[in-house]
A protein has these predicted regions:
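Conserved alpha-helical substructure of the radical SAM core
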Residues: 2-124, 218, 222-226, 230
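Radical SAM enzyme [4Fe-4S]-AdoMet core and its adjacent flexible, acidic
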Residues: 98, 121-124, 128-130, 134-233
Length: 233
């Protein structure tokens, strides 16, 4: 029976890729809270913190039938900062009750405060690291952000060393030379894996009301003369 379900789900995923109709969504990304507790230089989400939007228990419960229909196995809670939603763990409980795993993408500022609940309701955590301590704090415009992240990761790992915590780093002209320190810091924290992605400077992502003008893009985008240095890292 399980084999037939798996085969059907694989077919539905294939069908989704081959047509313009969604038949399968194994992973769904939700934004429980639109505001953020960082002020990152490469992101505009925090600039709209006053216009708060957040998901409720009713919102999540209302999605369950569709998630079941599309064969969803995992929900990634993104943001903004998902942990700013006061009912965040109730949302996770509803999803877990439907057999759906929850992953959390977070700034990491408050994971120590929520460690017990995270270990209970969230399958894994993905934190953001932008550099070593001074650079991370500067890019996020939050003094002490790095140490709060480090303390949170360390505490959770001390409770459950096998709990999976990974990191992602957005690479841009302010931190590309700090690539190796990022890896070293992640190792020292006990983070299981680090992934890297380039900064998006030209789309409407990250709550941009309009695409950045070229002068703003060049504050974040690597210049041509910096590429040789990037290749040496």
């Amino acid at each position: 029976m399980i084999g037939l379900q798996s085969l059907n789900h694989t077919y539905q995923r294939y069908r989704t890729l081959q047509t313009h109709r969604i038949s399968a969504l194994p992973i769904v990304i939700l934004m429980p809270h639109s505001a953020c507790n960082c002020r990152c230089v490469m992101c505009d989400i925090w600039k709209d913190n006053k216009n708060l939007k957040q998901l409720t228990e009713q919102d999540i419960s209302g999605l369950l039938a569709s998630l079941k229909q599309f064969g969803t196995k995992q929900v990634v809670m993104s943001g903004g900062e998902a942990l700013l939603n006061k009912n965040f763990f109730r949302l996770c409980e509803i999803l877990n009750g439907a057999g759906i795993k929850v992953s959390l993408l977070t700034t990491g500022l408050t994971i120590k405060n929520h460690a017990e609940q995270l270990l209970k309701w969230v399958s894994d955590i993905i934190v953001s690291i932008d550099g070593d301590q001074p650079l991370h704090d500067a890019i996020r415009n939050i003094p002490g952000a790095f140490n709060k992240l480090k303390d949170g990761v360390g505490y959770i790992k001390s409770v459950n060393p096998n709990y999976r915590i990974t990191a992602r780093t957005v690479i841009h002209r302010l931190n590309f030379w700090n690539w190796i320190p990022v890896i070293n810091e992640a190792k020292q924290m006990g983070i299981d894996q680090v992934s890297f992605l380039p900064a998006d400077v030209s789309s409407h992502a990250f709550n941009r009301q309009m695409a950045w003008e070229e002068p703003k893009q060049h504050e974040i985008l690597l210049s041509e003369h910096e590429l040789p240095e990037l290749k040496t890292i």
